UniProtKB/Swiss-Prot annotation:
Positions that bind Zn(2+): 1155, 1159, 1183, 1186
Region (Dimerization of protease): 485-489, 533-539, 572-584
CCHC-type ZnF: 387-404, 408-425
Ranges where the record places region Dimerization/Multimerization of capsid protein p24: 275-361
Marked site (Essential for RT p66/p51 heterodimerization) residue numbers: 984, 997
Taxonomic lineage: Viruses, Riboviria, Pararnavirae, Artverviricota, Revtraviricetes
Biological source species: Human immunodeficiency virus type 1 group M subtype C (isolate 92BR025)
Protein name: Gag-Pol polyprotein
UniProt site positions, description: Cis/trans isomerization of proline peptide bond: 219-220
Origin superkingdom: Viruses
Length: 1431
């Protein structure tokens, strides 16, 4: 204790002992806490001397802080003690531990802010905003986004389909990008238009919000000063690239790129939530799920979380363990908080589920009954063996039970002076009998240090160097290797050896440590030795430095001579010879495969097969079994998949097929390694070319051993003569969904080293087809091809000579390749009198294939023939248009057309032509009349479109195709005037992409047939249109009202809401002049017409298009649905004049009947009968009884839920006692016979029996101050308060309600004979038929809500300590970064209240993640306090 007493002295020690352990506590810090802290520091391998200075304390806290979240109570207590000691050293005045922690946190925040400001100042000095870079002249220059980046982005979207990984990938790829670059990235996404529309909406919202928060300054911009960017400037629509660069590099800068990027990320977050709504909190390990798979899913989702790195680290430390299954969680917690991910995965390997429990049980059993002894003799068929005595050599008993005299010396080594239990020598164990070492340890020989790392092969192969270099053979084998005999293991590897000049036959045994020979005379001295052998121990003579010659190779080492049943060459000699075990069938690593979670393998019965098919399948399977591709299995495998056979095309041979459809449904999904096939137009011209084919491709790759059982199939016997023969696959089966992906992945890994060693060789790989090109001379090229074939053969992949193409033309992937040109393989279109659906499908497929090099191919009319549900064998008559189209295609295909190869030094040019009937054709070339490839486009992505939109879609398709094939986009030549294009594109900048392009005058030119105005047309008539339909009876109405008093309503049958909205617009266009303004509330109709279609699949939309073309000018606008929102009086008139009013007629009658009975206010009727507010107010206004003094206004008084005000009022000479619940305005009232204390007390007790009454507030009337009332209040536990005499405001609520009650009584008095009846009717109307005030509730609904809320509040307050155990991570405002952890103060249905540092915030529930903090049960200094309480 004295050793650390010098940490504090004098005044500092006094200050230390004045500080309390926790706020409001009695205990103070003492000297013993310093001693405890110094000892704890030694436990954590920290120098206790650091406690003597404030700098040392700061270093300790820096070390401890990362572990606080998951640390023990002792660790947190140590941190709190050091923090308090730091404040004492720094002379910071604190009263307790919590205050010390707050002071340190405040100091750290200030330090962090200074660091960030310094970094920001450094960044401001130079432009960090790549791709904006500074050139030699000091100017800021923009480098356009590269084709490689665009290609990577397109692949990400296509492969991931807006899964969470898309956001970090976008963030990484768009680092420092300008808005123009970001738009280029977005617009390369050709598909996913729904997602792009969502993104566009988000950007528009953010741009509008920017404009609202950054209003334009009045007056002109000063000379030399940049204008401030608007929302559309940031989005890149109304700003130039130079303006964007200037804003980004100005002083001070406006980072328009980063702002726009933030908007896009907000939109991408919405899209990701829609496409894959997975939170990190939802990632939990299944009971049988391997820990590795769980970790993969966890980190995949964690990468997509928008949170700081500190938060992600916390999630990894806490959630990864917290959400593991119980088996893994037990192991992980035992590892402790500092375990690395590698340690976790190693510890949890193979853990989980029944299999794990079975292994644990088996392990326990094996320790009890160790039967892991392998016998060498071939007649031993199991672990059972005959026991033999080591003492006398007889069988049937053990040495410890032997009655014979005990042999002298040790039974293990034969030496005297010790027993076997004390023997230190290790046995030879060359027969792998685990007599001395139950765990199976093998003896290490002296030559074991020279052992080579053997590659895994399935045959014994001897490698070596020079025959004469004996020492090098044993010590240094790094030289060039020579091939020696390969010995298969189908039989025992016996070889002839020469030892001591004598020839012997010996067994090469890689499991034996030593070389043991039968009785043979050897030169030199020997020493006795005892080794473990068959049937016990045998005595041998040990000769050192003996020369042995095996297969022409020589080795020197130790040889044991004794009564061995077979000569053994052990590893001490084999390693010197360089002998290795090799596996030529399949050295490829297997890819682990599993079934989908919760699914079992297929159990489909075998179909009936004919005799010839059974014989054919039997022969095929026998051959496959001999080759090791399949293995026979027994009845223990419960799975089955049907198998059948078909004859090969143009052959008498049979082909085996397995119907893996059921297994494919149950197998987990694979990512396709390649998105499509390589295209010859992307090939660079090469001097020498070869095309290879991998033989039996799938059968060269092994299948995961654990998955093989699911591929089981059965070959039945004829007439069920015998049980069916059962097999399972050892290799990738044909027809299984995983085979293509695993094969492609395996082939890529195999080719990787060859590609790295031969960068001058280009290899295009698709499935089993290989294109190999180089600029080498033909001789050198063919030598490299042989190297490649040998490389593939080493891995078990053969390349048959019959498919080895050495001379052009090369047939590859359906193409025909020549040295300087390419084409598709010859296409013959069939001549038929009648065409089936299947024939036309094949015909369209051939024409589509030909269209990539033959320009002008069309298939639209042929495809129309296939519309509708038709059987494949149905006869389809060709229409006149289809026959014409087919004849044109035949003409095109008559002349062979060739494409050229790609030259990287030249630009790509794409030219598009319109063919009519929504069909387009295009050519991509680098030199005129030398096409790289051609194609067509004929899709209608929407039901309503126009030529400009179709042209932009074709441009997108070509650009995407170009990025995939060449990695860059071409320059476009388009048949459209620049003015026409820009007029349409202005409103669709986000949906389409504008590449570099130029006008080409190739008729027919594309044009817009009409254009909508941007602003209302002055002087033109305005039509307010609307439509509505009943879904059940399909009846509807459409109509309009104009600002000039005209109106029209038509009834429509068999219609929908959307059709009536369009019908209303059609009526307005039909009845209007050449110029018209139209206002609609339908986003559907607005979206169709604003896209300016000139053709549609809808007849009604075509009629609207015809009307629009006839008009000179049209303005179309949208307002929210016709409910008076935004003060649109004209739309309200439309509602009340016909269209909407028709829909409310039934409700109006019911509301009027209700009002005549109860005189409900307008809010109650609007809510109950779904009336527009204007209609409900009109009903109240037309009631003479409700217009005496206008409608009473109600307010909310901020009072406790248990407070009531009581008062007596008089009407018709009678006394009415009224009680009002202050918080809700709810009334209880009764006519009482007399204003006495007895009657009042009785009323109070009835009130207390119905509602929770805590306080009653009355005036000083004689009945209220009577002893009877006081006694009733005392008994019921009610506190009574009195108002101020002669001041009616102190009873304001009940006084107001008295007037309201009398007014309602006046409205219903004629409906009741007695006053007491009218009073109860008025109470009912007030409590349940009048809505208003906070929440728009009635008083009855409000009091129930307030009481229920009060109960919930009290229950939640009881759990406040539990709530404080939770931590909250939240997003603030529009910032996508997660903040936290913060302290949870309150959790409601819609929002939570949290405390972050000293700030208390209310955050919507959808923007928070609430997580239990398992690391510490008590916060702050409590841990320290509890620790000290134990002392």
């Amino acid at each position: 204790m004295g050793a650390r007493a010098s940490i504090l002295r004098g005044g500092k020690l006094d200050a230390w002992e004045r500080i309390k352990l926790k706020p409001g506590g009695k205990k103070h810090y003492m000297m013993k806490h310093l001693v405890w802290a110094s000892r704890e520091l030694e436990r954590f391998a920290l120098d206790p001397g650091l406690l003597e200075t404030s700098e040392g304390c700061k270093q300790i806290m820096k070390q401890l802080q990362p572990a606080l979240q998951t640390g023990t109570k002792e660790l947190i207590s140590l941190h709190n003690t050091v923090a308090t000691l730091y404040c004492v050293h720094e002379k910071i005045d604190v009263r307790d531990t919590k205050e010390a922690l707050d002071k340190i946190k405040e100091e750290q925040n200030k330090s962090q802010q200074k660091t960030q400001q310094a970094e920001a100042a450094d960044k401001g000095k130079v432009s960090q905003n790549y791709p904006i870079v500074q050139n030699l002249q000091g100017q800021m220059v923009h480098q356009p986004i590269s084709a490689r980046t665009l290609n990577a982005w397109v692949k990400v979207v296509e492969e991931k389909a807006f899964s969470p990984e898309v956001i970090p990938m976008f963030t990484a790829l768009s680092e420092g990008a300008t808005p123009q670059d970001l738009n280029t990235m977005l617009n390369t996404v050709g598909g996913h238009q729904a997602a792009m529309q969502m993104l566009k909406d988000t950007i528009n919202e953010e741009a509008a919000e920017w404009d609202r928060l950054h209003p334009v300054h009045a007056g002109p911009v000063a000379p030399g000063q940049m204008r401030e960017p608007r929302g559309s400037d940031i989005a890149g629509t109304t700003s130039t690239l130079q303006e964007q660069i200037t804003w980004m590099t100005n002083n001070p800068p406006v980072p328009v790129g980063d702002i726009y990027k933030r908007w896009i990320i907000l939109g991408l977050n919405k899209i990701v939530r829609m496409y894959s709504p997975v939170s990190i909190l939802d990632i939990k390990q299944g009971p049988k799920e391997p820990f590795r798979d769980y970790v993969d899913r966890f980190f995949k989702t964690l990468r997509a979380e928008q949170a700081t790195q500190d938060v992600k680290n916390w999630m990894t430390d806490t959630l990864l363990v917290q959400n593991a299954n119980p088996d893994c969680k037990t192991i992980l917690r035992a590892l402790g908080p500092g375990a690395s991910l590698e340690e976790m995965m190693t510890a949890c390997q193979g853990v989980g589920g029944p299999g794990h429990k079975a292994r644990v049980l088996a392990e326990a059993m094996s320790k009890v009954n160790n039967t892991n002894i392998m016998m060498q003799r071939s007649n031993c068929k199991g672990p059972k063996r005959t026991i033999k005595c080591f003492n006398c050599g007889k069988e049937g008993h053990l040495a410890r039970n032997c009655r014979a005299p005990r042999k002298k010396g040790c039974w293990k080594c034969g030496k005297e002076g010790h027993q076997v239990k004390d023997c230190t020598e290790r046995q030879a164990n060359f027969f792998r009998e685990n007599l001395a070492f139950p765990q199976g340890e093998a003896r290490k020989s002296s030559s074991e240090q020279n052992r080579a790392n053997s590659p895994t092969r399935r045959e014994l192969q001897v490698w070596g160097r020079d025959n004469n270099s004996l020492s090098e053979a044993g010590d240094d084998r790094q030289g060039t290797a020579l091939n020696f005999p390969q010995i298969t293991l189908w039989q025992r590897p016996l070889v002839n050896i020469k030892v001591g000049g004598q020839l012997k036959e010996a067994l090469l045994d890689t499991g034996a440590d030593d070389t043991v020979l039968e009785e043979i005379k050897l030169p030199g001295n020997w020493k006795p030795k005892m080794i473990g052998g068959i049937g016990g121990f045998i005595k041998v003579r040990q000769y050192d430095q003996i020369l042995i010659e095996i297969c022409g190779k020589k080795a020197i080492g130790t040889v044991l001579v004794g009564p061995t049943p077979v000569n053994i060459i052990g590893r001490n000699m084999l390693t010197q010879l360089g002998c290795t075990l090799n596996f030529p069938i399949s050295p490829i690593e297997t890819v682990p495969v599993k079934l989908k979670p919760g699914m079992d393998g297929p159990k489909v019965k075998q179909w009936l097969l004919t005799e010839e098919k059974i014989k054919a399948l039997t022969a095929i399977c026998d051959e496959m079994e001999r080759e090791g591709k399949i293995t026979k299995i027994g009845p223990e495998n419960p799975y089955n998949t049907p198998v059948f056979a078909i004859k090969k095309k143009d052959s008498t041979k049979w082909r085996k097929l397995v119907d893996f459809r059921e297994l494919n449904k149950r197998t987990w999904d694979f990512w396709e390694v390649q998105l499509g096939i390589p295209h010859p137009a992307g090939l660079k011209k090469k001097k020498s070319v070869t095309v290879l084919d991998v033989g039996d491709a799938y059968f060269s790759v092994p299948l995961d051993e654990g998955f093989r059982k699911y591929t089981a199939f059965t070959i039945p016997s004829i007439n069920n003569e015998t049980p069916g023969i059962r097999y399972q696959y050892n290799v990738l089966p044909q027809g299984w969904k995983g085979s293509p992906s695993i094969f492609q992945s395996s082939t890529t890994k195999i080719l990787e080293p060859f590609r790295a060693q031969n960068p001058e060789i280009i290899i295009y790989q698709y499935m089993d087809d290989l294109y190999v090109g180089s600029d080498l001379e033909i001789g050198q090229h063919r030598a490299k091809i042989e190297e490649l074939r040998e490389h593939l053969l080493k891995w078990g992949f053969t390349t048959p000579d019959k498919k080895h193409q050495k001379e052009p033309p090369f047939l590859w992937m359906g193409y025909e390749l020549h040295p300087d040109k390419w084409t598709v393989q010859p296409i013959q279109l069939p001549e038929k009198d009648s065409w089936t659906v299947n024939d036309i499908q094949k015909l369209v497929g051939k024409l589509n294939w030909a269209s990539q090099i033959y320009p002008g191919i069309k298939v639209r009319q042929l495809c129309k023939l296939l519309r509708g549900a038709k059987a494949l064998t149905d006869i389809v008559p060709l229409t006149e248009e289809a026959e014409l189209e087919l004849a044109e295609n035949r003409e095109i295909l008559k002349e062979p057309v060739h494409g050229v190869y790609y030259d990287p030094s030249k630009d790509l040019i794409a030219e598009i032509q319109k063919q009519g009937q929504n069909q387009w054709t295009y050519q991509i070339y680098q030199e005129p009349f030398k096409n790289l490839k051609t194609g067509k486009y004929a899709k209608m992505r929407t039901a309503h479109t126009n030529d400009v939109r179709q042209l932009t879609e074709a441009v997108q398709k070509i650009a995407l195709e170009s990025i995939i094939i060449w990695g860059k986009t071409p320059k476009f030549r388009l048949p459209i005037q620049k003015e026409t294009w820009e007029a349409w594109w202005t409103d669709y900048w986000q949906a389409t992409w504008i590449p570099e392009w130029e006008f080409v005058n190739t008729p027919p030119l594309v044009k817009l047939w009409y254009q909508l105005e941007k602003e209302p047309i002055a002087g033109a008539e305005t039509f307010y249109v609307d439509g509505a339909a009943n879904r059940e009876i399909k009846m509807g109405k459409a109509g309009y009202v104009t600002d000039r008093g005209r109106q029209k309503i038509v009834s429509i049958t068999e219609t929908t809401n959307q059709k009536t909205e369009l019908q209303a617009i059609q009526l307005a266009l039909q009845d209007s002049g050449s110029e018209v303004n139209i206002v609609t509330d339908s986003q559907y109709a607005l979206g169709i017409i604003q896209a300016q279609p000139d053709k549609s699949e809808s007849e009604l939309v075509n009629q609207i298009i015809e009307q629009l073309i006839k008009k000179e000018r049209v303005y179309l606008s949208w307002v929210p649905a016709h409910k008076g929102i935004g003060g649109n009086e004209q739309v309200d008139k439309l509602v009340s004049s016909g269209i909407r009013k028709v829909l409310f007629l039934d409700g109006i009658n019911k509301a009027q009947e209700e009002h005549e009975k109860y005189h409900s206010n307008w809010r109650a009727m609007a809510s109950e009968f779904n009336l527009p507010p204007i209609v409900a107010k009109e009903i109240v206004a037309s009631c003479d009884k409700c217009q005496l003094k206008g409608e009473a206004t109600h307010g909310q008084v901020d009072c406790s839920p248990g407070i009531w005000q009581l008062d007596c009022t008089h009407l018709e000479g009678k006394i009415i006692l009224v009680a009002v619940h202050v918080a809700s305005g709810y009334i209880e009232a009764e006519v009482i016979p007399a204003e006495t204390g007895q009657e009042t007390a009785y009323f109070i007790l009835k009130l207390a029996g119905r509602w929770p009454v805590k306080v009653i507030h009355t005036d000083n009337g004689s009945n209220f101050i009577s002893n009877t009332v006081k006694a009733a209040c005392w008994w019921a536990g009610i506190q009574q308060e009195f108002g101020i005499p002669y001041n009616p405001q102190s009873q304001g609520v009940v006084e107001s309600m008295n007037k309201e009650l009398k007014k309602i009584i006046g409205q219903v008095r004629d409906q009741a004979e007695h006053l007491k009846t009218a009073v109860q009717m008025a109470v009912f109307i007030h409590n349940f038929k009048r809505k208003g005030g906070i929440g728009g509730y009635s008083a009855g609904e409000r009091i129930i809500d307030i009481i229920a809320t009060d109960i919930q509040t009290k229950e939640l307050q009881k759990q406040i300590m539990k709530i404080q155990n939770f931590r909250v991570y939240y997003r603030d405002s529009r910032d996508p970064i997660w903040k936290g952890p913060a302290k949870l103060l309150w959790k409601g249905e819609g929002a939570v209240v949290l405390q972050d540092n000293s700030d208390i915030k209310v955050v919507p529930r959808r923007k928070v993640k609430i997580i239990k903090d398992y690391g510490k049960q008590m916060a702050g200094a409590d841990c320290m306090a509890s620790r000290q309480d134990e002392d």
